[in-house]
Amino acid sequence: VVVLLLLGLTLIQSYRQYFIAWAQDAKTYEAYNEGSVAIANYLISGKHNDTKYYIVMGGYEANPIQYLTHNKLEYKLLDEKQLKDLPLDQGKILVIVPAGNNHDAQLLDLKAKFPAGTISDIRSNINGKLLFSAFESK
């Protein structure tokens, strides 16, 4: 009986530690690509037929976005050189610039190329940290 009681208490404590304390830690959201999930949700929720979508990202880090937007949305992944070479005559565009080392410089490049564009910063609901910026041309 004592062993069963100890086993039951251990299960309760493990449940609380894993599903309550650990799951609500802000670092958990960073570790599990909160930014990528937020980008995918942002793109899907604001989908417009006349807009071309771009994400300044490549390789492995884009996998969660590709998975979450599969068959829901078309976009192109860009590296920094491709971002600078974006043509001016393509209509309305939305460029997602993830937070990171070159975030500010990439936004400056976009603003210089498309001066009428607007920037929206998207922050984490958990810790308020910048996740990405959405640049929209007019």
Task: Identify the function of each model-found stretch.
Residues 2-51, 55-78, 125-129:
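Membrane-proximal, lumen/periplasm-facing interface regions of secretory-pathway glyco-
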Residues 81-138:
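Aromatic/acidic, Gly/Pro-rich catalytic loop(s) in extracytoplasmic/lumenal soluble domains
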